[in-house]
Curated annotation (Swiss-Prot):
Family indicated by similarity: Belongs to the peptidase S10 family.
Tissue: Expressed in seedlings, roots, leaves and flowers.
Assigned EC number: 3.4.16.-
Protein's name according to its UniProt entry: Serine carboxypeptidase-like 29
GO cellular component: extracellular region; plant-type vacuole
Glycosylation sites: N47, N144, N293
Name of one Pfam family that matches: Peptidase_S10
InterPro entries in UniProt: AB_hydrolase_fold, Peptidase_S10, Ser_caboxypep_his_AS, Ser_caboxypep_ser_AS
Keyword annotations: Carboxypeptidase, Disulfide bond, Glycoprotein, Hydrolase, Protease, Secreted, Signal
Length: 479
C-alpha cells in the first residue's frame, strides 16, 4: 500500500527546491534532458542499442506537484518514429510498474526482484515510448501539498497530464510536431479520451504550441459504467463463476452503479460474487493466481491489478518482483529519484489515490463521438480472458456508440493462427486478442506487438475479410 507523504511535506519541499536549484546550476554543463539520461540500471547485465531517460516534470510549481516519466527511444530510426504515451489506470496504478516492467517496456524483472531481462516484444521496436505516472501520488510522482493526494480525479489528471506534455516537449524539442499517439488500458479508458480531448481543445487555441495528436488506442478500458457493469455480470455468469441468484442480484443492485464508487448494498453483492468466484486471477481467468500473495478475495472491489505473467517460465507473481525492484535505493538513484523525494514505500498502486478519487464521469462515450468527429484514429482492443473489464463490456459500449460498420466481424491471423477477432466501424476499429487477460501485452506479447504496429501504421490486421463479407452477402441475398 502506497504511503501518504503529507507528514514530511515541508522537508520534501526544501529537498525539491534544492534539487531544482542543483539542476539549474548544472544547466551550463548539461541540459536537463542530458541530466535525465539513464546510463545503466542495477541488474542490467546486457547492453541495449537505444537511449532512455527518466525524471520529473513540474505541473504546479506553487503546490509542488511533479510527475515522473520514463522515455525509451525506438531501437532503430528514433528520429523518424512516432512518440507514444502509455498510461495505466487504477485509478492510482503506475505505468512504470505495469506498462514498462510487465507489458510493453524493454526492461522486465526476474523473480529475484533484482535482475532485469530484455523483453523481446518491447514496443520501442516500433516507436518511441513514453511512460507517465499520473496523477501525483502514483509511483514516484509526488506533491509537496499533502491534500493533493486526496483530491485527485479525472479532471485534474487530464489537466496535469497536458501540462506535463507541454513542458516535457520543451525539454525534448525534437518531438515537437512529431506524430503522437496515446495508448493504455483499464481506467486509462477514462484518462486517454479525456487527455485527447484536452489536447484537441488546446490545439484549437494555440498554433505555436500544438501537439500533433494522431489518435489513441484503449485496451480493456472503462468506457461507460452501465454497459461495463452489464457486460461484466454477463461474462462472469456465462463462464459459470457465479450463481443465477447472485447474477440477478448484481443486475438489480449494481446495474446502474458507478464502477469505482459503488454503494454499500452493491458492495455486499460484489462480496458474495467474489466468494463464489474463489481465488482466481480475475484479470486473467485461465492462468494460475499468485499463491504467494495475500488472499485475492474481494477482487471485484479492488482497483489494483493482481496480475500474472506468461514468459519463458510462467510466473504469476510479477507484481511482487516489481515492488522489490523499484524500492531499491540504487534503482531510484539510477532513475534520478532523489532520496528525499522517493516514497517511503514505492508500490504498484496507491490506495490513497484510489480511495479518495474525486470525480469520475459515468460515461466517456460522448468524448468518443467528439474525437471521432475531430478525425482521430481510434482503436479499442480487448483481451477475452479478462473478468474485470471483459470483452462483453467493451462490445456493449461500442454498440451504444451506434457507429456504422465498415467491415464484417471476423478473425485476424498471426503466423497462421487466429490472434483474435476484429471489426471496423466508421471512426473506430475494434479488436479482440484471443487468450489475453486485462493486460493484453502481458499474456499475448507477440499478438500485442502486431496489434500496436497495425495501429500506428493505420493498416488492418491480417484477416480473411473478403470471404467473410462474401458469405454474409450470400446470406442476405438468400433471405
Amino acid at each position: 500500500m502506497a504511503k501518504t507523504r503529507g507528514s514530511c511535506c515541508l522537508v520534501n519541499a526544501l529537498i525539491a527546491i534544492a534539487f531544482l536549484a542543483t539542476a539549474h546550476l548544472c544547466e551550463a554543463g548539461l541540459s536537463q534532458k542530458e541530466q535525465d539520461k539513464v546510463s545503466k540500471l542495477p541488474g542490467q547485465n546486457f547492453n541495449v542499442s537505444f537511449a532512455h531517460y527518466s525524471g520529473f516534470v513540474a505541473t504546479n510549481e506553487q503546490l509542488g506537484r511533479a510527475l515522473f516519466y520514463w522515455l525509451f527511444e525506438a531501437v532503430e530510426d528514433a528520429k523518424s518514429k512516432p512518440l507514444v504515451l502509455w498510461l495505466n489506470g487504477g485509478p492510482g496504478c503506475s505505468s512504470v510498474a505495469y506498462g514498462e516492467a510487465e507489458e510493453i517496456g524493454p526492461f522486465h524483472i526476474k523473480a529475484d526482484g533484482k535482475t532485469l531481462y530484455l523483453n523481446q516484444y518491447s514496443w520501442n521496436q516500433a516507436a518511441n515510448i513514453l511512460f507517465l505516472d499520473a496523477p501525483v501520488g502514483v509511483g514516484y510522482s509526488y506533491s509537496n501539498t499533502s491534500s493533493d493526494l486526496k483530491s485527485n480525479g479525472d479532471k485534474r489528471t487530464a489537466e496535469d497530464s497536458l501540462k506535463f506534455l507541454l513542458k516535457w516537449v520543451e525539454r525534448f524539442p525534437e518531438y515537437k510536431g512529431r506524430d503522437f499517439y496515446i495508448v493504455g488500458e483499464s481506467y486509462a479508458g477514462h484518462y486517454i479520451p479525456q487527455l485527447s480531448e484536452a489536447i484537441v481543445k488546446h490545439n484549437q487555441g494555440s498554433d505555436k504550441n500544438s501537439i500533433n495528436l494522431k489518435g489513441y488506442m484503449v485496451g480493456n478500458g472503462l468506457m461507460d459504467d452501465f454497459h461495463d457493469r452489464l457486460g461484466l455480470f454477463q461474462y462472469i455468469w456465462s463462464l459459470g463463476f457465479i450463481s443465477d441468484q447472485t447474477y440477478s442480484l448484481l443486475q438489480l443492485q449494481c446495474g446502474f452503479e458507478s464502477f469505482i464508487h459503488s454503494s454499500k448494498q452493491c458492495n455486499k453483492i460484489l462480496e458474495i460474487a467474489d466468494k463464489e468466484i474463489g481465488n482466481i486471477d480475475q484479470y486473467s481467468v485461465f492462468t494460475p493466481a499468485c499463491v504467494a500473495n495475500a488472499s485475492q478475495s474481494n477482487m471485484l472491489l479492488k482497483k489494483r491489478p493482481m496480475t500474472s505473467r506468461v514468459s519463458e517460465q510462467y510466473d504469476p507473481c510479477t507484481e511482487k518482483h516489481t515492488t522489490v525492484y523499484f524500492n531499491l535505493p540504487e534503482v531510484q538513484k539510477a532513475l534520478h529519484v532523489p532520496p528525499g523525494l522517493a516514497p517511503s514505500k514505492w508500490d504498484t498502486c496507491s490506495d490513497v489515490v484510489s480511495e479518495h478519487w474525486n470525480d469520475s464521469p459515468s460515461s466517456v462515450l460522448n468524448i468518443y463521438h467528439e474525437l471521432i468527429a475531430a478525425g482521430l484514429r481510434i482503436w479499442v482492443f480487448s483481451g477475452d480472458a479478462d473478468a474485470v473489464v471483459p470483452v462483453t463490456s467493451t462490445r456493449y459500449s461500442i454498440d451504444a456508440l451506434n457507429l456504422r460498420p465498415l467491415s464484417a466481424y471476423g478473425p485476424w491471423y498471426l503466423d497462421g493462427q487466429v490472434g483474435g477477432w476484429s471489426q471496423q466501424y466508421a471512426g473506430l476499429n475494434f479488436v479482440t486478442v484471443r487468450g489475453a487477460g486485462h493486460e493484453v501485452p502481458l499474456h499475448r506479447p507477440k499478438q500485442a506487438l502486431a496489434l500496436f504496429k497495425a495501429f500506428i501504421s493505420g493498416t488492418p490486421l491480417s484477416t480473411h475479410e473478403n470471404s467473410i463479407s462474401r458469405d454474409m452477402s450470400e446470406l442476405v441475398s438468400d433471405s
